[in-house]
Each structure stands twice: as structure tokens, then as C-alpha cells.
Amino acid sequence: MRTLWILAVLLLGVEGNLVQFELLIMKVAKRSGLLSYSAYGCYCGWGGHGRPQDATDRCCFVHDCCYGKVTDCNPKTASYTYSEENGEIVCGGDDPCKKQVCECDRVAAICFRDNIPSYDNKYIQFPAKNCQEKPEPC
């Protein structure tokens, strides 16, 4: 319980997009991104290096690559708009950069949902020393 309280307090200090990303993951994948993907494999969480360990970790790798292509705004703080139409997330708004960030998050949330069967607890808190292989290009 104390851990959940700490996570809630930390989440309140996070701005814009990372909160939206968490909400999008919860809506699409029906699980908490913060609890499930903040420290998973070599790419889920802050930074990322080495090779993705499984399909779930690859979702984070692709998400990192997608954020890396965003140039006109900060993907970690840019707030975007989206709606749900016929059960699908649709990114909206007039700002192309924010829409691009939304698309990165939307695709990642769908990837997490589609790869729930690959999720393996052995990759939670995965040691960075196991992520030393040469990374593949985005």
C-alpha cells in the first residue's frame, strides 16, 4: 500500500504527456503502465539500451524510437487530445507535433495490449548489466 501511495505522489509531479500515456495504457491495455512497464526489460522505463528482451520490451523500444523522431515539441511533456471512436483511440488536435506524440503513445498502448501474453515477470527490474548488446537501429 505504501508503494502505491509513493507512486501516486510521484505521478502527481509528472507533467502532461506521461500522465496521458499512463491513462492511455490503462484504457487500451487494461493495466497500469506505471506498475507494469516503468521498469521492464531493457527499454521500458527511463532510457533504454541493448536489445529488447521480448515483444513487450520491443513495444518500449519502438515507442522510444517514435519519441526520438519528434522534433518540434517535447514528447514527455506535450499534452495532446484524443477521443475514442468505436472502441478505437483517435488522436486529434491541430498541432502536428502533439498529434505525433499521441500516435506514438497510441501505438505503444496497442502494442502492450497485443503482447500481454509475452509479458514475463523475469524482466521486471531487469538488471542493466544484461542490456549491453549493441542496440539495433530505429
UniProtKB/Swiss-Prot annotation:
Signal peptide: 1-16
Cofactor(s) demanded: Ca(2+)
Pfam families noted in UniProt: Phospholip_A2_1
Keywords: Calcium, Disulfide bond, Hemostasis impairing toxin, Hydrolase, Lipid degradation, Lipid metabolism, Metal-binding, Platelet aggregation inhibiting toxin, Secreted, Signal, Toxin
Subcellular location field: Secreted
Parts forming coiled coils: none
Keyword Secreted: yes
Name this protein carries in UniProt: Acidic phospholipase A2 Cvv-E6e
Role summary: Snake venom phospholipase A2 (PLA2) that significantly inhibits ADP-induced platelet aggregation in platelet-rich plasma of human, rabbit and guinea pig. PLA2 catalyzes the calcium-dependent hydrolysis of the 2-acyl groups in 3-sn-phosphoglycerides.
Disulfide pattern: 42-131, 44-60, 59-111, 65-138, 66-104, 73-97, 91-102
Listed EC numbers: 3.1.1.4
Stored CDD domains: PLA2c
Positions that bind Ca(2+): 43, 45, 47, 64
GO cellular component, one term: extracellular region
